[in-house]
Amino acid sequence: TLYEECNGIPLKGPNDIVFDKKGNFWFTDLGKQREREIDRGSIYWAKSDGSLIKEVIQPIMTPNGIGLSPDEKVLYIAETEGGKLFGFDISGEGEVQKVPFPYSIYGGKLLNNEGGIKRFDSLAVEKNGNICVGTLFTGGVSVISPSGDLVEFIKFEDPYITNICFGSKDLKTAYITASY
């Protein structure tokens, strides 16, 4: 185990991870759900050699998918419970520029909140900058532009599309996981 805590506070439920070009990583800590309560989550940045971890965003409700824009200037976070996608401008190593309250819930720009009964899960960013988010209940992948517009919804038979990543030599093949 590389990290178990940050500043004396235990990690509760690390979930998704994205590496930057320097080999450092950002990750979501979703927390835990119990019968009558749910933890507030956090976003962390860490060095892959185990020497430094920073809590970057806290509190944030059910942070799940995480990704970086192709130029690594924007950090994307998918909020599961609300089905929202946020973008945070990266201002330095392990730092984001936060939009002040009341203009933002968590400090990020709300990019997409289409509404309806859906939840966002994991995400991957295309080479062109579009954010592809596994979408629960509606069963598909929501393709969202960097400005927040829904470009396309790719429907699958399974209602629980939980993860997506790109692979193959040209990184144009999408691999998804479904869990229903």
Task: Describe each PLM feature range.
Residues 87-100:
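Short loop/turn segments immediately following beta-strands, especially the blade-tip
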Residues 31-41, 80-83, 136-137:
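Short, solvent-exposed loop/turn segments at conserved positions within beta-propeller repeat blades
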Residues 28, 78, 134, 175-179:
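Residue-level marker for isolated small/hydroxyl-bearing positions within beta-strands
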Residues 137-180:
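C-terminal closing repeat unit and adjoining cap/tail of repeat-based domains
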Residues 1, 41-44, 84-86, 140-142:
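A short loop-to-beta-strand structural motif that recurs across blades of beta-propeller domains
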Residues 7-25, 30, 42, 53-74, ...:
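Beta-rich, blade/repeat-based domains predominating
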Residues 49-51, 82, 92, 105, ...:
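Short coil turn/linker residues within repeat-based beta-strand modules
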